[in-house]
Amino acid sequence: MSGKGKSAGADKASTSRSAKAGLTFPVGRIHRLLRKGNYAQRVGSGAPVYLTSVLEYLTAEILELAGNAARDNKKSRIIPRHLQLAIRNDEELNKLLGDVTIAQGGVLPNIHQNLLPKKSGKGDKASQEL
């Protein structure tokens, strides 16, 4: 006897926790990292699923915005500059990742208002002539 009960012949392939939750990121790996990281003595079964879904959502959001930035610059490959532009131009992501430095990200283009050339109106020429 194999000890599998009545359905000894019908072996079903195991389904991963990522597939059960409908996620792409690995739930098992996140669970292992939570256990090995000494964050708590015990880790519940729902915590890694929730954390994995949050990580997957944030990654998808950042990559979508970075892809839009790459397309705006007529590029087909996302580089750190596109990630920087995507994060800094989004209010919520900028608040979340405000203290993060992205290597090779550059800075946002910003010219102070006082340094811009003044717009000359029609009455300016008469006032400057003496």
UniProtKB/Swiss-Prot annotation:
Gene3D superfamilies for the chain: Histone, subunit A
GO biological process: DNA repair
Disulfide bonds: none
Principal place of residence: nucleus
PROSITE patterns reported for this sequence: HISTONE_H2A (PS00046)
Keywords: Acetylation, Chromosome, DNA damage, DNA repair, DNA-binding, Isopeptide bond, Methylation, Nucleosome core, Nucleus, Phosphoprotein, Ubl conjugation
Residues the record lists as Phosphoserine modifications: S127
Record-linked SUPFAM superfamilies: Histone-fold
InterPro entries recorded: Histone-fold, Histone_H2A, Histone_H2A/H2B/H3, Histone_H2A_C, Histone_H2A_CS
Motif ([ST]-Q motif): 127-128
Pfam families: Histone, Histone_H2A_C
Positions marked as site (Not ubiquitinated): K118
Cross-link (Glycyl lysine isopeptide (Lys-Gly) (interchain with G-Cter in SUMO)) at residue(s): K125
Molecular-function GO term, any one: DNA binding
Localization per Swiss-Prot or TrEMBL: Nucleus; Chromosome
Residues with N6-acetyllysine modification: K4, K6
Keyword Acetylation: yes
Assigned GO CC terms: nucleosome; nucleus
Modification(s) after translation: Phosphorylated to form H2AS128ph (gamma-H2A) in response to DNA double-strand breaks (DSBs) generated by exogenous genotoxic agents and by stalled replication forks. Phosphorylation is dependent on the DNA damage checkpoint kinases MEC1/ATR and TEL1/ATM, spreads on either side of a detected DSB site and may mark the surrounding chromatin for recruitment of proteins required for DNA damage signaling and repair. Gamma-H2A is removed from the DNA prior to the strand invasion-primer extension step of the repair process and subsequently dephosphorylated.
Quaternary data: The nucleosome is a histone octamer containing two molecules each of H2A, H2B, H3 and H4 assembled in one H3-H4 heterotetramer and two H2A-H2B heterodimers. The octamer wraps approximately 147 bp of DNA.
Extra facts: In contrast to vertebrates and insects, its C-terminus is not monoubiquitinated.
Family as reported in the entry's similarity comment: Belongs to the histone H2A family.
Known function: Core component of nucleosome which plays a central role in DNA double strand break (DSB) repair. Nucleosomes wrap and compact DNA into chromatin, limiting DNA accessibility to the cellular machineries which require DNA as a template. Histones thereby play a central role in transcription regulation, DNA repair, DNA replication and chromosomal stability. DNA accessibility is regulated via a complex set of post-translational modifications of histones, also called histone code, and nucleosome remodeling.
Protein name stated in the entry: Histone H2A.2
Species annotation: Meyerozyma guilliermondii (strain ATCC 6260 / CBS 566 / DSM 6381 / JCM 1539 / NBRC 10279 / NRRL Y-324)
Lineage: Eukaryota, Fungi, Dikarya, Ascomycota, Saccharomycotina
